[in-house]
Amino acid sequence: MLGWAKIISKNGRYTRIAYSLEQDESCDGILEADAVDGLMRIIKPSASADPSSTKRFVCLIYAAMRRGTLTYKKTGLQS
């Protein structure tokens, strides 16, 4: 497992997702997925998170959302 992600809140338009690039309990940031325009934004990045690794991981999170496997529980993600 590369890291984890989980939905932390959801309303009609926005889904907020906590994620970590590690398997531990630390949170590397929060994403906001916009259902209207289809974009994902990093709204609270970790100061120690590597930007290029984060961008690659966001692609994995997006794919998990499209498959319907991302939930309110931690979802393990790997490349």
PLM ranges: what are they?
Residues L2-V36:
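N-terminal acidic leader/helix
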Residues C27-S79:
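Acidic, low-complexity intrinsically disordered segments
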